[in-house]
A protein has these predicted regions:
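An N-terminal hydrophobic leader/cap segment in hydrolases
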Residues: 1-21, 25-34
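Active-site glycine-rich loops that stabilize anionic/oxyanionic intermediates
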Residues: 38, 46-49
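Catalytic nucleophile-loop/oxyanion-hole region of alpha/beta-hydrolase
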Residues: 48-51, 77-107, 274-275
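Conserved alpha/beta-hydrolase
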Residues: 53, 58-82
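Alpha/beta-hydrolase-fold enzymes
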Residues: 114-198
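Short beta-strand/loop motif that positions the catalytic acidic residue
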Residues: 219, 225-227, 231
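Short alpha-helix in the alpha/beta-hydrolase fold that links the catalytic acid
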Residues: 221, 235-245
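Catalytic active-site module of serine/aspartate enzymes centered on a nucleophile-bearing elbow/loop
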Residues: 255-292
């Protein structure tokens, strides 16, 4: 079922719609359309947050000629269902494939794919699995490796079998999201964010993050990896391991930001500007390559 895209509301907020998954789950979509766009981007958000937190980034893309769609992953934002819950271990991958192909069917050219944190993991795994084949992939602080202990990772695997949807606090340290105190304050007060995770979701993150690193040499398309070296929410060593393995593919461009926190696109200035400068440069080079 295709998402029906309404016109932009008169109050200036982004158009929204719903899209049904094969198992009956409905996902909430947000669009930042652009007449005459030269391209498009699908954004996949991270754990506990939602697509509405990407308005500022979507506006940045709009200014550069890209239409944007975001969606609230299952268990998140305005999408209904248990917070942080999954029915099956690969639900988030199946959802991304459905949303991506639905969006692509409405466009003259397939969209770029951008994933942040857990969304970066979902995006990377979906590309490596061949579920989606965007013209390019952008990964921001992807959750490829956790700060959790090996014992906790093993416990998540066990609990995913016996109590897969047991609600647990995700333990995210809000103060390590960004150096911008307003970003942190807005996150704390955001009624659509949540602080939950389930064993099945945790096991997916741990397991598939390791799989992404193991399979990185098979990276099939141009990819920009943006890494916050002072990330306190995901272990940047996972991105470094991914970059080392992906080097042989010839597809990966990696940019490290030594003092920045997890949410690179929401960092305090001048950090945010430096990140966006690198993103703009990479996008420009992809455009030139596509024209050759």
């Amino acid at each position: 079922m295709h998402a029906a895209l309404p016109n932009r509301p008169a109050d200036g907020t982004e158009p929204t719609a719903w899209l049904d998954m094969a198992d009956g789950q409905r996902l909430f979509l947000r669009d930042w359309p652009l007449a005459g766009a030269r391209g498009a981007v699908l954004i996949v958000h991270g754990l506990g947050e939602h697509s509405g937190r990407y308005r500022r980034l979507a506006a940045w893309f709009n200014q550069r000629g890209y239409a944007v769609r975001g969606y609230d992953q299952r268990g998140h934002g305005k999408t209904p269902g248990r917070r942080g819950g999954l029915r099956h271990g690969d639900d988030l991958l199946e959802d991304l494939a459905t949303v991506y192909h639905d969006y692509a069917s409405s466009l003259p050219h397939p969209p770029l794919l951008l994933g942040h944190s857990m969304g970066g993991l979902v995006a990377a795994r979906s590309v490596l699995d061949g579920r989606v084949a965007p013209p390019a992939l952008l990964l921001s602080s992807p959750a490829l490796r956790s700060w959790e202990s090996p014992g906790m990772i093993r416990l998540a695997r066990v609990l995913s079998r016996i109590a897969p949807n047991l609600p647990l606090r995700n333990g995210l340290d809000f103060d390590k999201l960004s150096h911008d105190r307003q970003v942190v304050a807005d996150y704390r007060s955001d009624p659509l964010r949540h602080g939950w995770i389930t064993p099945r979701l945790a096991d997916f993150i741990f397991r598939d993050g390791a799989r992404c690193i193991a399979d990185a040499a098979t990276l099939p398309l141009p990819t920009l990896l943006l890494v916050a070296d002072s990330d306190g929410l995901v272990d940047p060593a996972g991105s470094r391991a991914f970059a080392r393995k992906a080097a042989s593919s010839g597809q990966l461009t990696t940019r490290f930001f030594s003092t920045l926190y997890h949410e690179l696109f929401n960092e305090a200035e001048p950090g945010r500007g430096q990140v966006l400068m690198q993103l703009a440069d990479w996008l420009g080079r992809q455009t030139l390559s596509a024209r050759r």
